[in-house]
A protein has these predicted regions:
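Cyclic nucleotide-binding regulatory module and flanking cytosolic helices
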Residues: 1-33, 41, 69-70, 75-76
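Phosphate-/nucleic-acid-contacting segments
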Residues: 149-164
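A small-molecule sensor/coupling module
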Residues: 101-141
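Cyclic nucleotide-binding regulatory domains
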Residues: 32-90
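A short, Lys/Arg-enriched amphipathic alpha-helix from helix-turn-helix/homeodomain DNA-binding modules
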Residues: 139-152
Length: 164
């Protein structure tokens, strides 16, 4: 199975810079829409704790990940018109701030390398997902998905609740 390590050191630098400007949120053991591109498409979201799912229109599951996670890091540079929702899958804490402010702060604090590293990691994760799914039969796709779930924490793996 292909695996790529989340760039936690770079996340830490970005979080340290951005956190003092963000609006905090916390959800306790509930599924909640954290981000919806039709409501707050011009914000950067930083997830500090919890598990989140990324969904496309009609509730199509794109992926599930554990904190820490940053969504919308590049939205201050390039508008994204694809309808996405980020949903908490239980306890979740984090913050959000305007994407343009995120870019300004990255520029002021010379964190382009860290931002690039984070975005490169996200791109690689999506690339690996595509490699596992595109051009493979259903058995191979299910097998690849189950193998990727090995890296999830026990709480996430044991969840049997269906998504909204």
């Amino acid at each position: 199975m292909l695996s790529v390590v989340k760039p936690l050191q770079e996340f830490g630098k970005l979080d340290k810079c951005l956190s003092r400007y963000g609006t905090r949120f916390e959800f306790n053991n509930e599924k909640q829409v954290i981000f919806s591109s039709d409501v707050n498409s011009e914000d950067t979201f930083v997830i500090l704790e919890g598990v989140i799912s990324l969904r496309r229109e009609e509730n199509v599951l794109i992926g599930i990940t554990q904190a820490p996670y940053i969504m919308g890091l590049a939205d201050g540079l390039m508008k994204n018109d694809i309808p996405y929702k980020l949903i908490s899958e239980g306890n979740c804490t984090g913050y959000h701030l305007p994407a343009k402010q995120t870019i300004t702060l990255i520029e002021q604090n010379q964190l382009w390398r860290d931002a690039f590293y984070w975005l490169a990691w996200q791109n690689r994760i999506l690339e690996l997902r595509d490699v596992q799914l595109i051009g493979h039969n259903s058995y191979e796709q299910i097998r690849a998905t189950l193998l990727s779930m090995i890296d999830w924490n026990e709480e996430l793996r044991s969840r049997t609740e269906r998504s909204p």
